[in-house]
């Protein structure tokens, strides 16, 4: 069965850590492709700093040179709150022959009990769990709540890049460079669109 990874997020902005973890998961799990899915509105995040279409454009620019990466507009076109379960159900219906792998950071997975229809999600998707620097996942407690994760997940050590979109926005607001932190095409787009200014 073909394996495809999904990396969802606000990507506000997308940066090299996103790309590095996607590539790590692709290689370690033998994924034929990684699909980046920018969210329209995440239920656990209150604010976006750029529009969904600007974040979509930055994501397309960031992955342009990797043929194993693609972008889906499924959540942007849906608009409203983006629930992962809705996306996975749609992907399963459209392409039932694919084994879908959610690529998630350990810090995000720690909040799984707060995700909409989390138990259904664990039945439909597999999880590629990337360790987040400075965050220790309480794996036994998570398995107590979601025992099926033991068979439907792989923990990946991966590249430990302590880089966040919050930090990048702060740098941009302070007039500091983000070169070598985001792809050049993304940096150019941010400057052209005058994003993340104070």
Curated annotation (Swiss-Prot):
EC number per UniProt: 2.7.7.18
Catalytic activity: nicotinate beta-D-ribonucleotide + ATP + H(+) = deamido-NAD(+) + diphosphate
A Pfam family annotated for this UniProt entry: CTP_transf_like
Top-level taxonomic group: Bacteria
Gene3D superfamilies: HUPs
Enzyme class: transferase
Keywords: ATP-binding, NAD, Nucleotide-binding, Nucleotidyltransferase, Pyridine nucleotide biosynthesis, Transferase
Signal sequence coordinates: none
Pathway per the UniProt entry: Cofactor biosynthesis; NAD(+) biosynthesis; deamido-NAD(+) from nicotinate D-ribonucleotide: step 1/1
GO terms (BP aspect): NAD biosynthetic process
GO molecular function: ATP binding; nicotinate-nucleotide adenylyltransferase activity
Physiological role: Catalyzes the reversible adenylation of nicotinate mononucleotide (NaMN) to nicotinic acid adenine dinucleotide (NaAD).
Family to which this protein belongs: Belongs to the NadD family.
Name the record gives this protein: Probable nicotinate-nucleotide adenylyltransferase
């Amino acid at each position: 069965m073909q394996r495809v990874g999904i990396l969802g997020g606000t990507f506000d902005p997308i940066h090299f850590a996103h790309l590095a973890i996607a590539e790590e998961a692709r290689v370690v799990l033998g994924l034929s492709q990684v699909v980046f899915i920018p969210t329209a509105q995440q239920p656990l995040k209150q604010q976006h700093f750029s529009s969904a279409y600007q974040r979509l454009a930055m994501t397309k620019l960031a992955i342009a040179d990797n043929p194993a990466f693609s972008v889906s507009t499924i959540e942007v076109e849906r608009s409203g709150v983006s629930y992962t379960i809705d996306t996975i159900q749609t992907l399963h219906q459209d392409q039932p022959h694919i084994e879908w792998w959610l690529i998630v950071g350990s810090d995000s997975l720690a909040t799984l009990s707060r995700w909409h229809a989390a138990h259904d999600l664990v039945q439909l998707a597999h999880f590629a769990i990337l360790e987040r620097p400075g965050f220790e996942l309480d794996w036994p407690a998570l398995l107590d709540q979601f025992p099926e994760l033991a068979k439907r997940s792989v923990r990946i050590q991966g590249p430990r890049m302590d880089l966040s979109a919050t930090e990048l926005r702060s740098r941009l607001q302070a007039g500091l460079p983000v070169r070598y932190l985001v792809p050049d095409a993304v940096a150019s787009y941010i400057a052209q669109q005058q994003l993340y200014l104070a």
